[in-house]
């Protein structure tokens, strides 16, 4: 929960609801809810199983992608994937993103 609180607040989301085992954040355009039950913690997450592969968040600019990397990910020692922010021309022209993992190894993407 602490990771998503810090990450989503950094992106400009505000916490709109919270309880013992859940929390939700919104930014006026989207809402994100996270649940965390201790009894399921040991089963782990793998993005290749059926279900969620990763979550992507839209950046306003390439500079915002770089800023997330340098101001949020690196100082917190968050695991960054694929060498950091870069272009992915195989997706589309100008696709610029940074991929990283949350503490449960869920892959996240911040893309311009």
Language-model segments: residues:
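Core segments of cupin and vicinal oxygen chelate
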Residues: 1-33
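Short, contiguous alpha-helical
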Residues: 100-112
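Alpha-helical elements of the RecA-like P-loop NTPase motor core of helicases
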Residues: 2, 66, 108
């Amino acid at each position: 929960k602490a990771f998503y609180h810090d990450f989503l607040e950094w992106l400009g989301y505000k916490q709109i609801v919270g309880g013992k085992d859940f929390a939700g954040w919104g930014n006026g355009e989207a809402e994100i809810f996270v649940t965390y039950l201790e009894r399921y913690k040991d089963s782990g997450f793998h993005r290749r199983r059926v279900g969620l592969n990763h979550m992507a968040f839209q950046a306003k600019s390439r500079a915002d992608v770089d800023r997330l990397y340098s101001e949020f990910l690196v100082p917190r020692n968050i695991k960054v994937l694929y060498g950091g922010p870069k272009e992915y021309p195989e997706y589309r022209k100008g696709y610029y993103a940074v991929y990283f993992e949350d503490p449960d190894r869920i892959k996240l993407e911040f893309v311009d």
